[in-house]
Amino acid sequence: MALPPDRPDFTDLATPSDHKALKRLADMDTATSASSEPESQKRGPSGAVLGALIAPGSPSFFRNWLLSALLLLLGFVIPVATVVVALVRRNEITSLVLDENFLLALQVIAVLFVVTRLISVVEVIRSRSEGSPRRLASTLGVFGVILLALPAVWSVARANDLSGVINDVFVSSGSDDPLAANGDASGDGFKTILLLGGDEGPGRWALRTDTMILVTIHEESGRIAMISIPRNMYKMQFPPGSAMANEFPKGFPELANAIYPYVFTHEEISATYVRGDLQPEAIALASGISYSMNITIDDYVLVNMQGFLEIIDALGGVTLTLDEELPMPGNIPGAKTQYPPFIGPGEVTMDGTTALGYARSRSGDSDYGRMGRQRELLTAIASQVEGSDILSRFPNLTEIMRWTVRTSLSAGEFSSLVDRLRSGASINESVGLIPPLINPGNPNFTDITNLIDALQASIRDDVDFPYA
C-alpha cells in the first residue's frame, strides 16, 4: 500500500544492522506464539493418542490439570495398584476371587479403565485443529479404545459369572449355629466340616455318599485332622425325636452311604430336614454322624465324584508318590481315558481320570485302603495347588463348581478352608474308622467317640495321636 504524500518513506534510510534487529524481533515473536500452543498440539496425533491410551489424562495436563489428575488416578493408578495387590497376595487369591465385594470392585475398575481412556482420547481429538490431524487422531483413538475394551468386557463378564457361581454354590452368609450339634462341650475350639463325595451313576439309587470325611480344625493353632467314615458302616444312630430316629429307632439298618439317597426318596422325612437352600439329605446324614460319634459338625461340602475328576483336570493334575504298584479299577462312568492295568510304584502325575481311579480302586486292597488313598489325595491336591494356578484356571473351575459342588459354607468360609488345607504341614493326623480300631459292621460308637476325642486332643496339644 502506498504511503500518503505527506508521510515520507524511511525504509530506505534503515541500515543493515537495523534490518537484522527487526528480523530477530520477528523470530522471537514466532517462538513465543509457538510456545503458547497446547502441549498436545506440539505432539503428533499418534503420540498424543498413545499417551491417552497408556496414561489417560496425561496429554491434556497443561490444559486441565484437575481433569488429567482424576483420569490418571481412576484409569491408571487404581488398576495398576489392583494388579500389584493380586500379585502380592497371590497365595490368598482364593479368598479374593470368592469375595463378591472384590468382584464388584473389579467390574467397576474395568469399566473405569475404558471410560477414562475414552474421555482422554476425546480431549486429544478436540485439541487438534480441523483437517487431517483431527481425522488421524480420531481413527487411532477409536481403534485403541475398542482394542482395550475387549479384555475389559471379558473381565466384567467373568466377574459377573463368578458372582453367579458364588450365589449358586455357597450360602449368602455363614451361620454361627452348627449344622448338627451333639450337646457336648468336648469339641470346643474346633470347627468340623463333613466332606461328602457323591457317587451318582448308572444303577445307583439316587446319590450315594461313598466318600465321607470329617475335617476337624483346631481354630487357635490351625492344625487339622481328617477322619474317614467307612461307607459300609452300619447302625448309624439319629437324635431322639428326629424323623430318622422315629423311622429307625435301633439305627439305620443299611450301609451309611445309603442314608443320603434314602432321605432323598422319602419326601415326608426330607421335609423335616429342610433348612433354607441347603440339601436336607446332607443335613440328615450330618445329624446321624454327629449324634452317633458325639461330635459337633459345623458345615458340609458335597462334591459329585464326576466333578472331582473335572476339578483335578482344571487344576492341571496332581502328583503322588506310590510305595507299591496299585491295580486300577475297570472303566468308571465319566472316565475320559482307558485305565492302565497298574500305576506306580514311584512318582505318578495323575490327571482327573487317573486320580479318580486311584481314589476308587479296591482291586489291590479293600474299601479301607481306598479310604486312606482318598485322604492322601485330598492332602496332595490341597498342598500342591498354587495361588497362581487357581487364578489362571479359575474360569474353568467356576463352571465345574456350579454343577458339582454344594455346601453350607459361605464363600469366605470356603476360601478360608481351602487356604488352610493348602498348608500341607497343618494336616497333622489322618485316621480311618476301620479294623482293627473299629468294626464298621457292628460299631461301638463309644469307642469311636473316645477315638475322636483323643484325635482332637492330639492336635490341640500338638502331641502324637495314641491310636496311630
Language-model regions, residue ranges each:
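N-terminal targeting leaders characterized by basic, low-complexity, disordered sequences
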Residues: 1-32, 62-70, 74
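Internal/C-terminal transmembrane anchor helices
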Residues: 131-163
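Membrane-water interface of alpha-helical transmembrane segments
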Residues: 42, 65, 69, 96-110, ...
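Cytoplasmic membrane-interface segments at the C-terminal ends of transmembrane helices
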Residues: 59-66, 117-137
